């Protein structure tokens, strides 16, 4: 009998979900659905039960350390590496410049990158809203070089397999994991680059939460608050002052192409 339900019953359900290993976000999703359902029940006079959303303690999101990033950003020797290994290094740089989701990285096409304008267009995003993301100077140089090796048509995927096809979700994750392990970094999560981008953008690069919201493609600022507290910043500063990639590469050597014929 739904009318016999008490708050204690719902508390017990939350405890059972927590004991089953569900994440706070998953538990919140379930309680949000129940809250909507019982709001309707209350309107119909079936119950008088108010369900608060599950509140969990905010935990600090794991990120890559500067030492780990330095190892991951070390450029492979193009004369000795495979295309896949070189591509993975470019993707690592792209993730740290843009804070992209893995699905977005897979969806970017060659035509979406405007190197002269210094931006990349996201046409396929989680919230189905197109985005324009700035590229810092080091990222532009890296993509120019990558484009010369990658080749392809404008509608081809920017980050492809060695046969030119789109990377699968598992293929991308496995490639990044292998790259990290080759560099001696035990963390292998591609999503950690998104967390790292958010932390470094705000703390190390002086960015602000409102601009970060746009860069991460969050629909509301509340979503961005899961990554950070709000910081004030000058929105007119050059993106090179904000980009985590530019900050890591400050003072670094320019890209050198191998001699022709080798």
PLM features: residue spans?
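Conserved catalytic core of the tyrosine transesterase superfamily
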Residues: 1-262
């Amino acid at each position: 009998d739904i009318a016999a339900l008490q708050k204690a019953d719902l508390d017990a359900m939350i405890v059972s979900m927590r004991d089953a290993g569900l994440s706070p976000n998953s538990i919140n999703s379930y309680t949000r659905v129940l809250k909507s359902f019982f709001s309707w029940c209350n309107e119909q006079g079936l119950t008088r039960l108010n369900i608060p959303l599950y509140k969990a303690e905010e935990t600090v999101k794991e990120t890559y350390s500067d030492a780990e990033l330095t190892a991951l950003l070390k450029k492979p020797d193009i004369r000795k590496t495979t295309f896949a290994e070189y591509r993975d290094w470019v993707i690592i740089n792209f993730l740290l410049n843009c804070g992209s989701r893995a699905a977005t990285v897979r969806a970017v096409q060659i035509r979406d990158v405007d190197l002269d304008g210094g931006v990349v267009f996201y046409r396929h995003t989680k919230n189905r809203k197109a985005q324009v993301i700035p590229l810092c100077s080091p990222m532009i140089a890296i993509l120019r070089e990558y484009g010369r090796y990658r080749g392809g048509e404008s509608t081809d995927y920017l980050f492809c397999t060695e046969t030119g096809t789109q990377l699968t979700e598992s293929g991308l994750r496995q490639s990044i994991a292998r790259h990290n392990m080759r560099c001696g970094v035990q963390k292998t999560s591609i999503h950690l680059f998104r967390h790292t981008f958010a932390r470094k953008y705000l703390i190390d690069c002086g960015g602000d939460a409102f601009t970060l919201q746009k860069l991460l493609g969050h629909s509301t600022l509340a979503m961005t608050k899961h990554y950070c507290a709000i910081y004030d910043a000058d929105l007119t500063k050059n993106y090179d002052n904000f980009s985590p990639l530019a900050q890591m590469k400050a003072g670094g050597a320019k890209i050198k192409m191998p001699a022709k014929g080798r």
